[in-house]
Amino acid sequence: MKLKCSLTVRTYKADVRERVLAAIEQIAKGCAVAAGLPQDKMPEVNVLKTEHVNAVYNNPELTKRVAAAVKNAIGEQNVVQKSPTMAGDDFADFSLADHSIPACMFNVGAVDPVKAAESKKTGAPLPSLHSSKFLPVPEPTIHTAVIGMMATVLELTKK
């Protein structure tokens, strides 16, 4: 009999990722020992080093500039700072693992304001981006996103 278990491990820092991966292997083997498995039945933990996504790192100085430009363009009340999330995105690769290229990733709200207010009131989560129930409101979402991006481009290209 063979059991295969696949996991996605997400961390904000590479050293934490290495510790988590080592702990997974240690726990798997510890459980096998505790269950009395013979040596030839010990779990084999394979980590695919190439199959991971680095954490997105928003450069603080760049993020301040982008946030100020977007606030100026669409109104400060329409820009909120979000807590870090464990969402995986290959955007992280643009700044490289050492963050030597400044990057800033931001989201654009796309939910019906009535549903957003209801979610805030009740605590019920809204469907996430990859959910089949995610239903963005095209306008004003597209308009707002274009204004925000243009404000960012103008800020970052001014002399």
Question: Which ranges hold each PLM region?
Answer:
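Metal-dependent amide/peptide-bond hydrolase catalytic core
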Residues: 1-159
